[in-house]
Every structure is written in structure tokens, then in C-alpha cells.
Amino acid sequence: MKGQSMILKDLAAELEEVVSPINLDCEEEIETEEVDCPAPFAVEAVCHVCEQVLRLAVVASPDGILQLQQLLLTDSLSFLCTSCSREAFCNRRPQRNGS
């Protein structure tokens, strides 16, 4: 250090003046907002290939569940079990987004 020689006691006193302690135990309360967390829905479907029963849990709005139900009932969406999925994608890269 250049200038006056300082001792640890002086340094601590200087730092104490610069850093004023803040009381973190104040009586202030923050209002908490409750977030609506939709309940999960149980979906049962069958594998498109082997017809094994598949059980899924999904979280969606009531409109989303209705849309999923319509997709499943019109055969425009089908699921594969893990075994059939592995067999379908064995030795090739899965196509993405229908391409």
C-alpha cells in the first residue's frame, strides 16, 4: 500500500462506515398470487400397431382436452407403445414434424 500504513482495525472501521447494515427482518409482507394449476387428465388409448392399452397423463385446458378427444376419436392421431415405437424407428432417423 502506498501512503499511510493502515492496520486491520482501521480498515474494518472504514468499511463499517461505507457499508451500512440493512435490517432484512422487516415487517413487510408480499402478497402471493395463487396460480391456477390445471388438474391432470388420465387418457387411455391403444397402440396403433399392437393395440396394447396405453395410459397417459396430460395437463391441458378443458378446450385442449376436448381437442385431444376429437383427434383421438377421428383417427387423425394415434399413439405407439414403446416397443412398437422402437421397432418403427430402428436403424433410421425419425421424421420431424411430418417431413
Curated annotation (Swiss-Prot):
Highly phosphorylated. Signal peptide: none annotated. Residues 1-37 are annotated as: E7 terminal domain. It comes from the Viruses. Keywords: Activator, DNA-binding, Early protein, G1/S host cell cycle checkpoint dysregulation by virus, Host cytoplasm, Host nucleus, Host-virus interaction, Inhibition of host innate immune response by virus, Inhibition of host interferon signaling pathway by virus, Interferon antiviral system evasion, Metal-binding, Modulation of host cell cycle by virus, Oncogene, Transcription, Transcription regulation, Viral immunoevasion, Zinc, Zinc-finger. Pfam families: E7. A motif (LXCXE motif) lies at residues 24-28. A zinc finger (unnamed) spans 47-84. Disulfide bonds: none annotated. InterPro entries: Papilloma_E7 (IPR000148). It is found in: Host cytoplasm; Host nucleus. A motif (Nuclear export signal) lies at residues 65-73. Homodimer. Homooligomer. Interacts with host RB1; this interaction induces dissociation of RB1-E2F1 complex thereby disrupting RB1 activity. Interacts with host EP300; this interaction represses EP300 transcriptional activity. Interacts with protein E2; this interaction inhibits E7 oncogenic activity. Interacts with host TMEM173/STING; this interaction impairs the ability of TMEM173/STING to sense cytosolic DNA and promote the production of type I interferon (IFN-alpha and IFN-beta). Belongs to the papillomaviridae E7 protein family. This is Protein E7.
